[in-house]
Each structure stands twice: as C-alpha cells, then as structure tokens.
C-alpha cells in the first residue's frame, strides 16, 4: 500500500517564519477575519503560500494587545481597552509593578451576551520613579500609562587608554 508523504517545506518554504493561523490567536469577543475561517486557497493548491504575518497582521491596536516602550526620556505602556469605560478600569502601582485591571459585567452586544475581565502587569524600569507615573485614556480607547526616566547625572567624559608593556595573561609554564 502506497502512502503519500507531504513534505512541509514544499508548502511552507520559510517554515520558521510561518505564523500559525490567527484562529487560535484570537481574543474571545473579538471578530475573526474571513481568511481565518475559510482556507479554500490552501486546499486548492499545495503550493499556495499564505502571506507573511507582517504583511497581513493588523497593528497592535486592532488586536487587543499592548505595547511597552522604553525611550530615552520616558517609559510608556499603550493598551487597547476600547471595550471598557473609564469607570471599569483601574491602574495601580504596587512596588515596582504597574497593574492594570479592567472588568465589565455581562451585557448584550450584537452577538449575544458577553462579559470581559483582564489583568496586566508591567515591571517599572529602575530609572523611573513610581510616584511620577500617570495614565490617560484616549477617545479611541487606548490607555496610556507613562512616567519620565531619570536623566543620567554628570557630563560625558572620554577615558584615555594607556599602553602597558607586560601581557595581561601570563604565559603558561613550559613542560
């Protein structure tokens, strides 16, 4: 009996860079793309290659994810919380951790009833004073938590290099 063997590199020549289907990466309560539900193109041809994720993936704001940035002068976290009102969100600083919590009770939307809750924690960098951290909510549902970074004190100086005549590593004794 003959058994057909399908080699994965024929279908996905860039296997390490191939991302899994977004179907399993979705957040509950969010929409799916039509391409996530119907894989007709992949079943019609063994040579069909799905576009790389960086070409087809939406930005972080459309996926419900967060973005943490550490810039030269500030630390910031941007978090998509468009499904929550300001009263349903809490931002706390506990030691060197920022904790963001959002919760809304069950309510009806166009697909039925849904309730949501999330907890996110972010470590505050050592050069950010926890007392200076602020948060704001934009009109499009992006929560921004940020704080200024402490500036490095003292001016920059060049350290001269001296040359020594002896080796840094002593020679091993000969046998």
From Swiss-Prot:
Segments forming domain sHSP: 56-164
GO molecular function, a single term: protein-containing complex binding
GO BP term, pick one: cellular response to gamma radiation
Key words, A-Z: Acetylation, Chaperone, Cytoplasm, Eye lens protein, Lysosome, Metal-binding, Methylation, Nucleus, Phosphoprotein, Secreted, Zinc
Modified residue annotations for N6-acetyllysine: 92, 166
Subunit structure of this chain's protein: Heteromer composed of three CRYAA and one CRYAB subunits. Aggregates with homologous proteins, including the small heat shock protein HSPB1, to form large heteromeric complexes. Inter-subunit bridging via zinc ions enhances stability, which is crucial as there is no protein turn over in the lens. Interacts with HSPBAP1. Interacts with TTN/titin. Interacts with TMEM109; in the cellular response to DNA damage. Interacts with DES; binds rapidly during early stages of DES filament assembly and a reduced binding seen in the later stages.
GO cellular component, one term: nucleus
Pfam families listed in its UniProt record: Crystallin, HSP20
PANTHER family, A to Z: ALPHA-CRYSTALLIN B CHAIN, HEAT SHOCK PROTEIN HSP-12.2-RELATED
Induction or repression: Induced by HSF4. Induced by calcineurin and transverse aortic constriction in ventricular tissue.
Similarity-based family: Belongs to the small heat shock protein (HSP20) family.
Annotated function: May contribute to the transparency and refractive index of the lens. Has chaperone-like activity, preventing aggregation of various proteins under a wide range of stress conditions. In lens epithelial cells, stabilizes the ATP6V1A protein, preventing its degradation by the proteasome.
Listed name of the protein: Alpha-crystallin B chain
Localization, UniProt: Cytoplasm, Cytosol; Nucleus; Secreted; Lysosome
Residues annotated with Phosphoserine modification: 19, 45, 59
Annotated stretches, region: Disordered: 145-175
Residues engaged in binding Zn(2+) 2: 104, 106
Gene that this sequence comes from: Cryab
Positions bearing N-acetylmethionine: 1
Annotated residues for binding of Zn(2+) 1: 83, 111, 119
InterPro entries, per the entry: A-crystallin/Hsp20_dom, ACD_alphaB-crystallin, Alpha-crystallin/HSP_16, Alpha-crystallin/sHSP_animal, Alpha-crystallin_N, HSP20-like_chaperone
Tissues where the protein occurs: Abundantly expressed in the lens of the eye. Expressed in ventricular cardiomyocytes of the heart. Also expressed in skeletal muscle and the kidney.
């Amino acid at each position: 009996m003959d058994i057909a063997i399908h080699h994965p590199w024929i279908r996905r020549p860039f296997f390490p860079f191939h991302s899994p289907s977004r179907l399993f990466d979705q957040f509950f309560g969010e929409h799916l793309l039509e391409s996530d539900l119907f894989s007709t193109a992949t079943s019609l041809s063994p040579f069909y290659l799905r576009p790389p994720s960086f070409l087809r993936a939406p930005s972080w704001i459309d996926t419900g994810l967060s973005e943490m940035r550490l810039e030269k002068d500030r630390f910031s976290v941007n978090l998509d919380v468009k499904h929550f009102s300001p009263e349903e969100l809490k931002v706390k600083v506990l030691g060197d951790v920022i904790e963001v919590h959002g919760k809304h009770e069950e309510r009806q939307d166009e697909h039925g009833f849904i309730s949501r809750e999330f907890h996110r924690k972010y470590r505050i960098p050592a050069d950010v004073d926890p007392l200076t951290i602020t948060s704001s909510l934009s009109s499009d549902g992006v929560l921004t938590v940020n704080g200024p970074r402490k500036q490095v004190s003292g001016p920059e100086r060049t350290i001269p290099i001296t040359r020594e005549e002896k080796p840094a590593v002593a020679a091993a004794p000969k046998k």
